[in-house]
Amino acid sequence: MNKVRGNRIFNYFWSVSFFLVALFETVNAQPYNSERYSKVMWNYLEVLSEFGPRYVETEGYEKTLRLIKRVGGEFADEVLEHTFFVKQHDGGQRQMVNIEFIFNGNAEGRPILLGAHYDTRPFADQESNPVLQTHPITGSNDGGSGTSVLLGLAQYLKEYPIKQPVRLLFFDGEDFGQSGSGEMFLGSKYHADFLRKESREKWPQAVIIVDMVGDKDLEIFKETYSMASGPKILDRIYNVAKRMNSFQFNEKSKYTIQDDHLPFAGLGIPSVVLIDFDYPYWHKLSDTLDKCSPESLSVVFSVLVGVLLEW
């Protein structure tokens, strides 16, 4: 699972340089400092990891909400809070919230939605020790990496506005319940239900979810639900990655994964997830910052920027 690749640092800087040259030749884009954005995203991931567990009603959760809303207030054209309630087994309710950043662009048409969950697993259910299974995880990669990439994109979209309308959506409750309980992907399910009540003209034309994209040994295969729902989106993404000479994007299919893209795919919206599921620390207490890499965040960020510019 934990594959080793040689000469990673050289390959990373060569791939980013190759990508930028190719991108500026094919797209009327302004050059940007990729190293700067890499540091920005890594700083966010450091902060999120320092917050500790970030599931609803924890201190880390509240700090994360404040961070996301502060970044949105600084960079987005508008910030929306979508509050919803989850029924508890004791008959009570628990409040959760999705945060949406709106970037209007200057072109007509439906927006592109990029999403990530910001919550973390309340229990380490993949630990072999039953005692450890009751402890909450830090979730540096699972919950932290996707959030950090979206926060970095928010700054980019402010500093280099693009014509395409974009929504950045931070989901609550993705990792809340036991597997198979129906108490997972709560934020994305809520937003899909919210869209059902809206005019289809307001629906996103495409959904791209980023999840677990920060690990040091990053390799993103094509996920099978994504291939069924959004094959053309995957083609866009992997074509950009190919020009970028990014070995982190593998065009083969490997996993079938339930994630935040499925509620939108259920509406008929082309939806995909970018995820590296070959991560031995998934839902374990060892999902910590030292397992992550700023290079991985930067590669995913650069590919997403390229996709947005070419849309």
Regions found by a protein language model. Give the residues of each.
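Bacterial N-terminal signal peptides that target proteins for export
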Residues: 2-14
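Bacterial N-terminal signal peptides
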Residues: 14-25
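Second-shell loop/turn segments in exported
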Residues: 31-35, 50-60, 86-89, 132-143, ...
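A non-catalytic alpha/beta surface segment that caps or lines the substrate-entry region
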Residues: 43-106
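Acidic/histidine-rich catalytic neighborhood of metal-dependent amide-processing enzymes
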Residues: 134-236, 256, 261
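Active-site-adjacent substrate-binding region
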Residues: 206, 213-311
